[in-house]
């Protein structure tokens, strides 16, 4: 499409070269959305926009989730809050993308007519063009594709953490879980070629990253498109050959396709972390059948046994849905039993949310809210107890942490920084008097001194250790700080030197006094 630019518009663009337009990307949902949001930010920056600092941006992009009903409410609530700002500033633009946009393509502009652009999961790369077209034509642009336009990982990226990165190995899903709307929104599975994935990882490492997380709706089915059933385990082993890559994680696998070659690759590849997220969803075989999950509780528990045999210190997390249609008290008790046997480090528990367009939405015996709530509270109480007990076992252990730019809510009060252990447990730690303060991306070895359900603490006590290993990732963080404000800024802000361009609601690392 060719646009004719008037002299007035040309002058307007020249003004913008002096004062660039600002943007913000607000992200809801899963890690795949975080990955896509980083691409949206990269596209906007390549188009000349800069991230907003402290006030409403000229361009606000919502990258949405459609898994839960409250995602709809959150989006429309936030759009409503922006309406006065849009009315006061006609040049402001609002874009809505992601899974909810793919699903509600015909609804968003009706419910929020002040939105300028609606785009889907398959055409992230079109965002700058759609924004410019909406501005030029002075009318909203709706563009939803039914198949992938460009693989998102090939798009420009503005990463929020120079020390780690998300790497998508596939998009879409071939499973047909009755509660899930994602396959209808992201399509059938499409796999990237191994060489492209490894090249992206190598580029991340060369930019300073020491950790990557491999992403897919079902990572262990990777290779189905090119007929290699062991492609994922081979990919993990290939990651082990990349010099400078210290930590490899992945999410999420599916129990039905989780094979022993993957467990062996995890155990035998030095930089694959002792962490596994394995979605259970329900401990009831009847409910699993109704969910169309294609495994049963005995297979699930068998996977955990095999993982713990080969990786004894593995921390295993899960997803669980409470209140699926037709779930009886007996079914729910089966879930509690599997949770008790599994000893998850943590669990992401959800109350079943009826999603129009999914087979489960039409099932009989939808449960009353009060029943679901009561079961949910029993499940979370059990898992919180297990998490606290499993974390208590870490007290006295020496663990290596990668320092993160996010910190705990009480960081300013406690003077603690935060990091992730190899098994992904969150640890808040204090720097001993006289020791050097680490940067995000540096690695510290500490002794765990306290434990709670959701985090660990490492404070300087007699007999405890504190060892700092400065890393390339920390150097990259310093460089990003210098590029943003002229000089490195100690341990403050996000990886790119200021407010995150991709908003996740994460706290920033505190400023510690000189030691």
Curated annotation (Swiss-Prot):
InterPro entries: Elp3/MiaA/NifB-like_rSAM (IPR006638), Methylthiotransferase (IPR005839), Methylthiotransferase_CS (IPR020612), Methylthiotransferase_N (IPR013848), Methylthiotransferase_N_sf (IPR038135), MiaB_methiolase (IPR006463), rSAM (IPR007197), rSAM_horseshoe (IPR023404). The keyword S-adenosyl-L-methionine applies. Its cofactor is [4Fe-4S] cluster. [4Fe-4S] cluster 2 binds at residues 173, 177, 180. The keyword 4Fe-4S applies. [4Fe-4S] cluster 1 binds at residues 30, 65, 99. Keywords: 4Fe-4S, Cytoplasm, Iron, Iron-sulfur, Metal-binding, S-adenosyl-L-methionine, Transferase, tRNA processing. Binds 2 [4Fe-4S] clusters. One cluster is coordinated with 3 cysteines and an exchangeable S-adenosyl-L-methionine. Residues 1-20, 491-503 have a biased composition (Polar residues). Residues 21-136 form the MTTase N-terminal domain. Its main location: cytoplasm. GO terms for molecular function: 4 iron, 4 sulfur cluster binding; metal ion binding; N6-isopentenyladenosine methylthiotransferase activity. Residues 392-462 form the TRAM domain. Its EC number is 2.8.4.3. It comes from the Bacteria. Residues 159-389 form the Radical SAM core domain. Monomer. PANTHER family: CDK5 REGULATORY SUBUNIT-ASSOCIATED PROTEIN 1, MITOCHONDRIAL TRNA METHYLTHIOTRANSFERASE CDK5RAP1. Catalyzes the methylthiolation of N6-(dimethylallyl)adenosine (i(6)A), leading to the formation of 2-methylthio-N6-(dimethylallyl)adenosine (ms(2)i(6)A) at position 37 in tRNAs that read codons beginning with uridine. This is tRNA-2-methylthio-N(6)-dimethylallyladenosine synthase. The gene is miaB.
């Amino acid at each position: 499409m060719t646009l004719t630019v008037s002299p007035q518009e040309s002058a307007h663009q020249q003004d913008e070269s002096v004062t660039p337009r600002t943007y913000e990307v607000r992200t809801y949902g899963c890690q795949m959305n975080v990955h896509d949001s980083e691409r949206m930010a990269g596209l906007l920056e390549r188009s000349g926009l800069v991230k907003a600092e402290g006030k409403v941006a000229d361009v606000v992009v919502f990258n949405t989730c459609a898994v839960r009903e409250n995602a709809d409410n959150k989006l429309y609530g936030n759009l409503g809050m922006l309406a006065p700002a849009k009315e006061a500033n006609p040049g402001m633009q609002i874009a809505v993308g992601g899974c909810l946009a793919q699903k509600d393509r015909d609804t968003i502009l009706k419910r929020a007519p002040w939105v300028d652009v609606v785009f889907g999961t398959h055409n992230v790369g079109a965002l700058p063009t759609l924004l410019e077209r909406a501005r030029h034509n002075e009318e909203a642009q709706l563009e939803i594709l039914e198949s992938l336009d460009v693989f998102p990982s090939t798009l420009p990226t503005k990463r929020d953490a120079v020390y780690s990165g998300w790497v998508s190995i596939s998009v879409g899903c071939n499973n047909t879980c009755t509660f899930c709307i994602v396959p209808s929104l992201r399509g059938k599975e499409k796999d990237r070629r191994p060489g492209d994935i490894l090249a992206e990882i190598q580029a991340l490492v060369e930019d300073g990253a020491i950790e990557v997380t491999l992403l897919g709706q079902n990572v262990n089915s990777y290779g189905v498109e090119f007929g290699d059933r062991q492609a994922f385990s081979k990919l993990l082993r290939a990651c082990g050959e990349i010099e400078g890559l210290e930590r490899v994680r992945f999410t999420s696998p599916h129990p039905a396709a989780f094979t022993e070659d993957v467990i062996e690759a995890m155990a035998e590849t030095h930089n694959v972390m002792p962490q596994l997220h394995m979605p259970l969803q329900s401990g009831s075989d009847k409910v699993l059948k109704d969910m169309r999950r294609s495994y049963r509780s005995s297979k699930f528990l068998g996977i955990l046994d095999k993982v713990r045999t080969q990786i004894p210190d593995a921390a295993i997390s899960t997803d669980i849905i409470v209140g699926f249609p037709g779930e009886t008290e007996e079914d729910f008790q089966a879930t509690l039993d599997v949770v008790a046997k599994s000893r998850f480090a943590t669990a992401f528990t959800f109350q079943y949310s009826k999603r129009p367009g999914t087979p489960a939405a039409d099932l009989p015996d939808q449960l009353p809210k009060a029943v679901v709530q009561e079961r949910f509270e029993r499940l979370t109480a059990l898992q919180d107890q297990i998490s606290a007990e499993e974390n208590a076992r870490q007290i006295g252990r020496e663990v290596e942490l990668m320092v993160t730019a996010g910190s705990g809510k009480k960081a300013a009060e406690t003077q603690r920084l935060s990091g992730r252990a190899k098994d992904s447990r969150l640890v808040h730690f204090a720097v001993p008097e006289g020791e050097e303060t680490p940067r995000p991306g540096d690695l510290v070895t500490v002794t765990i001194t306290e434990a709670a359900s959701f985090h660990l603490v490492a404070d300087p006590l007699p007999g405890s250790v504190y060892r700092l290993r400065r890393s390339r990732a920390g150097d990259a963080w310093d460089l990003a700080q210098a590029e943003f404000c002229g000089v490195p800024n100690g341990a403050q802000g996000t990886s790119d030197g200021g407010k995150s361009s991709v908003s996740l609601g994460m706290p920033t690392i505190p400023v510690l006094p000189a030691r």
